[in-house]
Amino acid sequence: DDCSSRGLGDVYKRQSVGKPDLSTTIFGRKIDMPIFLSPCAMQRLYHHDGDKASAKAANKFGTFYSMSTMANNTIEEISNLSSGPKLFQLYVHKDQSITNDLIDRCRRSGFDGMCLTVDTLVAGNRERDYRTGFTTPPKLTLKSLLSFAMHPTWVFNYLIHEKFKLANVATKTDKGTNIAKSVIDYINEQYDPAMNWKDAEYCVKKWNGPFALKGVMSVEDAKKAIDIGCSAIMISNHGGRQLDGSRSPFDQIKAISDAVGDK
């Protein structure tokens, strides 16, 4: 009917779509698309180039690359490799000198922004890992040996390239951070479960640049993040892996955006 016709007409605005401009600005850097690479630990598990490959890809497509504290390459390696926009994902450590060192190295290496993860103070009960048999350090089982046999290229690259380690913190523990040391062990040994708002504010001030709080799930926390000087927030993307009884992060977007989206 006539009402439906007018309503449908409103849907299809007469906008030029010949060459759409997808660019936007984040942390003072213009990027070519409203998408960037989120930090991901241990990227060499799926490709021998690890973070190097991700940084190159982000640079190629004109967007942010984000580095995890638990990356397999160093801050300096990535800085020398890519001139594109870069973000570092930080955790508050029990030993504050480790936290300070990571912040200082990022500043010297020209990183554009920093985010502090606040929803992984302890390791989650990763049920999928139990089902698939994934462990660090790896356990040689019939299933894993079969998987290695089915992926000879991965095995070959693992054998000929440098050994796995958490490159940015490899010298910070007596036991080291090679593949023989569980990532979960490092989290439990080094991450500070007593982290609070004062710790977050300390990191914001020490970085003294574009800073995001990563892992926010409530309007109250979003407002508090702005109050302590954060320039952005990241709604939790860990979801049920960390706390399976929580709401979906997607369901929190509108309320948080309405509360602090213009700040």
Give the predicted meaning of each segment:
Residues 89-99:
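Outer-membrane beta-barrel proteins
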Residues 2-8, 12:
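Single conserved hydrophobic/aromatic residue that forms the stacking wall/gate
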Residues 35-38, 63-67, 86-90, 114, ...:
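Hydrophobic faces of well-ordered beta-strands that scaffold small-molecule active sites
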Residues 75-83, 226:
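Acidic (Asp/Glu)-rich catalytic clusters
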Residues 11, 20-27, 66-78:
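Short, charged beta->alpha transition segments
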Residues 31-70:
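Glycine-rich active-site/cofactor-binding loop and its immediate structural neighborhood
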Residues 14-35, 196-198:
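N-terminal amphipathic alpha-helix/helix-capping segment at the start of soluble metabolic enzymes
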Residues 56, 97, 101-263:
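Alpha/beta enzyme core
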